[in-house]
Amino acid sequence: MNITCIIPTLGGGGAERVMLQLCAGLVGRGHRITLLTLYDAPDFYTVPPGVERVQAHADPQAQGMWARLKRVWLWRRAMKRTRPDVVISFMALGVLAAAWLLRVPYIFAEHLDVSKVRLSRQWLKWRLFLLNRAARVVVLSWRDKAYIARHYPRWKTSVIYNPAFAPQQRQLPRPPYFTAPHTVLAVGRLTRQKGFERLLEAWQLIQPRFANWRLCIVGGGEEKENLISLAETLDVQGSVSFVPPQKDLCAAYQYADLLVMSSRFEGFPLVLLEAMAAGVPAVSFVCNGPDVIIRDGTDGFLVPQGNTDLLAEKMAQLMQDESLRQAFGSRAREVCGRFSPEHFVQEYEQLCLAARK
């Protein structure tokens, strides 16, 4: 099959990495894959071998009806060049108007908690128009499927979890930003969604008891200065590192003692899958994704949403007990079997085959 995979950009993020993994997996199964990116932006990731790259060069900032029509025209022109049998789009719904105009079957994959998507009435109508013409809609949880079923046929909605890849078995040098004997790792865009201010508040509660530990937050975003200021206000700046986004976190996972997720909502976080695949125990607030990936009390801890006191308590429980960290970490590696890459690619391939019929 000729499959065109679409994503807004190849900027840093979990959905972008999942898309590249899907492209590589489909190429490995003998399909011709074209990756279409919609907007001009620096690439954070490298396109896998065997995947053709096409860029639409649309302007995401242009406003007004004519600007939107021009975007659809650019997308349609770029898509037509790829001659797709079927289209898979991650996080880019508007581009599917071009697929509809070309009469190409399309699959739309949402990579956020769909209940958190906020749209005006006008955009909601447009969204539903395009969704109801999709061959399939893919979501990341059964909760999302139940939510979207209010507007979209349940039988046309599929739940496909993101995959967990086993890390390479080789010793890597310790990351230079891991400057303490023990590290609590947090990774993600510095936005309100990720709730890092709550993590800093939890860290303040326990940090005096753990002089040999450091909190390392990896990521960039609009909240960076606010978070740095909050760390100073909480007087924890001496035990917290803010690290720019990293293309490869394998070494960080290899040396981290604990991963913490403080998100208000998630899709199916790749960071959590990767860390656990590397044997890192995790603590997370309950939300879509982590509540499926983490087995509470078996390979990590789940904490009621927003309970920073309990988040701090569960972090401390693991930080002070090396044997518990090792036991949780050993069982965490089982994510590679629970969410296998082979099953992930096969499910998308089956959807593409069904969409062509």
Question: What does each model-found stretch correspond to?
Answer:
Residues C5-G13, R17-M65, A149-H151, V159:
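N-terminal strand-loop element at the rim of the active site
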Residues P245, R264:
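Aromatic "clamp/platform" in nucleotide-sugar-dependent glycosyltransferases that forms part
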Residues Q63-G64, R118, A146-R150, Y161-A180:
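Acidic anion/phosphate-binding donor-loop and adjacent secondary structure
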Residues E16-Q21, H182, A186-P208, E222-S229, ...:
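A conserved mid-protein helix/loop that constitutes part of the nucleotide-sugar donor-binding site
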Residues P281-S284:
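Short hydrophobic beta-strand element within catalytic cores of glycosyltransferases
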Residues I88-V95, E110:
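Short His-centered aromatic/hydrophobic patch
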Residues I228-P244:
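Nucleotide-activated donor-binding/catalytic signature segment of Leloir-type glycosyltransferases, i.e.
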